[in-house]
């Protein structure tokens, strides 16, 4: 924060910060290994993630949520009667990057985790704002290859698995969330996303 331009930006422009994989390592999940990556002197990915989250929480301009929720990154930012912004966390509660073709939900198919999905659905249902904006770490329909598993199957970093047909893997959790939004009749939900290096609507 020694740069006058950075300080000016922070004092004049509202910012919403989100946890990203690069706080730890590219395409971070608990399954990631940096054992053969010479850039890392610390090889324990969970320890790297804890250090990255601490640095993020100490540096990011976020409103505190109290001692009980000091490590929680997902949050709601009310913007008056026009908008509620739901900032979700697609990194801290996800299962390992895998072949992403599991037929049933479980810890290995989590992207948000059950508590966060329920928090989001409950918040969207309670919201009286005209627009419900979901700020997502990454697009929900993007498929990002992340190497191969021990059996030679493609591993996936994001929600989608690149397969046609019924949802499988991480898509199951997202399908449950989207179905919950539809079944509750929640209107004016808009997804805003980052992580990709282009704009689209």
Give residue spans per PLM region.
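Metal-dependent phosphoester/phosphodiester hydrolase catalytic core
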Residues: 1-201
């Amino acid at each position: 924060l020694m740069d006058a331009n950075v300080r000016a930006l922070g004092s004049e422009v509202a910012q919403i910060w989100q946890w990203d994989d690069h706080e730890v390592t590219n395409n971070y999940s608990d399954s990631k290994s940096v054992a053969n990556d010479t850039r890392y002197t610390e090889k324990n990915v969970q320890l790297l993630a804890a250090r990255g989250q601490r640095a993020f929480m100490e540096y990011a301009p976020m409103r505190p949520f109290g001692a009980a929720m000091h490590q929680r990154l997902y949050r709601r930012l009310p913007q008056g009667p026009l908008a509620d912004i739901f900032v979700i966390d697609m990194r801290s509660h996800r299962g390992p990057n895998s072949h992403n073709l599991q037929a049933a939900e479980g810890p290995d198919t989590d992207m948000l985790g059950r508590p966060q999905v329920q928090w989001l659905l409950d918040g969207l249902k309670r919201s009286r704002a005209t627009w419900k904006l979901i700020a997502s770490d990454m697009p929900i329909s993007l498929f990002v290859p992340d190497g191969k598993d021990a059996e030679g199957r493609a591993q996936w970093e994001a929600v989608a698995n690149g397969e046609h047909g019924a949802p499988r893997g991480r898509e199951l959790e997202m399908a449950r969330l989207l179905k919950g939004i539809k079944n509750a009749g929640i209107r004016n939900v808009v997804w805003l996303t980052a992580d990709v290096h282009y704009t689209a609507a």
